[in-house]
Amino acid sequence: MTSLLFVILNIILTLHLCAGQTPAADNNKRLICYYDAQSYLRPGFAEMKLSFLKTAAEFCTHLIYGYADLNDDLYEISSLNVDLDMFHYKEITSLKAEFPHLRIYLSIGGDHDNGHYDAGKYMRFLESGKDRQNTFIESAIHLLKMNDFDGLDLAFKLPTNKPRKVHSEFGLLWKKFKKLFTGDFIVDPDAALHKQQYTEFVGNLARTFRNANLSLTMTVLPNVNSTWYFDVSEIYNNFEYINLFSFDFLTPLRNPEEADYTAPIYLRDEENRLAHYNIDYQMNYWVNHGCPAHKLNLGIATYGRAWKLSAKSGISCKPVVRETLGPAEPGLQSNISGLLSWPEICSKLAITNGAGYKGADAPVRKVQDLERLYGNYAFRPADDNDEHGIWISFDDPDFAGIKTNFVKTKFIGGVALYDLSYDDFRGLCTGVKFPILRSVRGHL
């Protein structure tokens, strides 16, 4: 009897320890994993081999392959890298044989569209008419079927909001006064027409895809104004789910002169922050306009945004941080100015004793969000010559878990993790591979 009780207690303990990392197949919440195929070609430790992707596939319910292009001369879907995609498409979709729970989609658009953000291309496509759009749809079905994708993800690069501008107190008063007479700045004067055209296009696309036994999803990219382009109540039913990229509200490129939380859960109503620069606002907008919460997935980034500090930025560096100097230097892995992958951030935080480290090698100080509302940041003040200063806004694995709890509280359908290649897929920081992915899965 004692032996039997011991065995039962061991089983219970084992189940409890494993509960934090439930495989995707055992959980009805979605975990959408974005895979940037270009990471397959990155040099050194940045190269994401198929073996790493297999580790992630256990935890993901859906995998989104990024990215395909829109050829606006032929009105067809096309490859951004034919030499890679001609074999890599099927290499990735073949993962379904080993992971039968996994559904794999091809995404069109994203932020990799031939290296520049060409919103005009998508506007021209919406204006092109049904015949040319049908040409695109036929080409998409052919490409998806030929390579065994389960569906298409629309990540159209539509025009974005103008970035928040830095104003003095007098400047803010003048802006409010001026707005009385001029109104808001108009990014797209034909937004109402484009909204109608997008609604008609996705309706036609969804009907055709259903007949072809293909799924359709949508990704709302950062700073794309949903009010302008998405008739929420009319379009949501055309999609299996909708991913809201509720991060990068501020970036060093869009906001070079000030640093702030890039993906807060809630609004910190001070320092003249904009009311829509937070997750809660974005989710509420879609739900309040008719989209069921279970159709939505919350986008969580596995990277941080990094600003270069000046001497005038001060030494406390509490956000909002003024007098910043745009993007910080790129990391060795990500190689993008103003962006640091989680292992790159973790390596800067790992130095517990700063003695002997100076300049760019000096440690950064992490400031943890004890309120669990806004996010973490880390910084190193600049010297008197405006050198070596850095300020980073990021979600570590713990805060990604906090955001996942928000998803559960709000009855949201799941999480869209962007991007697997910026998580610590080699386990360089703590020895655990994909710590952010694992944290999200453990909290779903």
From Swiss-Prot:
Signal peptide location: 1-20
CDD domains (alphabetical): GH18_IDGF
Top-rank taxon, per record: Eukaryota
Location relative to the cell: Secreted
Domain GH18 span(s) in chain numbering: 29-444
Disulfide bonds: C33-C60, C346-C429
Any GO CC annotation of this UniProt entry: extracellular region
Keywords of the record: Developmental protein, Disulfide bond, Glycoprotein, Secreted, Signal
Modification(s) after translation: Glycosylated.
Glycosylation positions in this chain: N213, N225, N335
Keyword Cell wall biogenesis/degradation: no
InterPro entries for this protein: Chitinase_II/V-like_cat, Chitinase_insertion_sf, Glyco_hydro18_cat, Glycoside_hydrolase_SF, Glycosyl_Hydrlase_18, IDGF
Gene Ontology MF terms: chitin binding; chitinase activity
Keyword Transit peptide: no
One GO term of the biological process aspect: carbohydrate metabolic process
Function: Cooperates with insulin-like peptides to stimulate the proliferation, polarization and motility of imaginal disk cells. May act by stabilizing the binding of insulin-like peptides to its receptor through a simultaneous interaction with both molecules to form a multiprotein signaling complex.
Additional observations: Lacks the typical Glu active site in position 157 that is replaced by a Lys residue, preventing the hydrolase activity. Its precise function remains unclear.
Family indicated by similarity: Belongs to the glycosyl hydrolase 18 family. IDGF subfamily.
Name of the molecule in the record: Chitinase-like protein Idgf1
Source taxonomy: Eukaryota, Metazoa, Ecdysozoa, Arthropoda, Hexapoda
